[in-house]
Amino acid sequence: MDFDAQLIRFFGTADIDTLAPERLLEGVKLLQMQFGLERDSDRRFELWCLMYMLGVAPDPDPTFEDEADREAAHEFMAMADREIDEA
């Protein structure tokens, strides 16, 4: 997953700390819309991970039909939370 490329795609920059609140909200809305339209499971998972890192991801259990995707989402959440705790 190339999070920087996705940040640039949806927010116009990889450094979202520099964004005005309204631009951040606009990017989140675009990201959520793309997530809702996406049918490819790998791409959908990548978008979900980015939303999780931004604090706007939906609950993975009702979101992912495939058990493997749900498990991967929970593993990603645990990994990301560990890294945040260690920082």
How would you label these PLM feature ranges?
Residues 1-37, 41-87:
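Long, compositionally biased terminal regions
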